[in-house]
Amino acid sequence: MAFKVVVSDSKTGKSYQFETESTALIGKKIGDEISGSVVELEGYKLKITGGSDKCGFAMRHDIHGAMKMRVLLKSGPGYNVKEKGLRRRKSLRGNTISKDITLINTKVVEYGSAPLGGEPESIE
């Protein structure tokens, strides 16, 4: 299973996309810190901020586990409120990375010696 890992650099405001076949990411949760060596960024430390599964359902930090659930939402990730007081039931993925996750969003917490550099790869 291949993961697309998007690394966001808060200093420059740019994002970089990498692909990895690593199974070291399975079982990690939103908020966990991982080594940048998973995506060939030696010396970097990355924090998992979210992701989505193969069907496009977003991960949510307050749903524990790796399963997909239909939850009633009034705000937050996975739902944009159109009117005040409006609630809606949405399908979302839990906060744990499993084999069904295809996209993982991360941000840089600790920088390595080499610059991130290069242009972000386009998603096709």
From Swiss-Prot:
One of its GO terms (cellular component) is ribonucleoprotein complex. SMART domains: Ribosomal_S6e (SM01405). One of its GO terms (biological process) is translation. Pfam families: Ribosomal_S6e (PF01092). The keyword Ribonucleoprotein applies. InterPro entries: Ribosomal_eS6, Ribosomal_eS6_arc. Keywords: Ribonucleoprotein, Ribosomal protein. GO terms for molecular function: structural constituent of ribosome. PANTHER family: 40S RIBOSOMAL PROTEIN S6. Belongs to the eukaryotic ribosomal protein eS6 family. HAMAP family: Ribosomal_eS6. This is Small ribosomal subunit protein eS6.
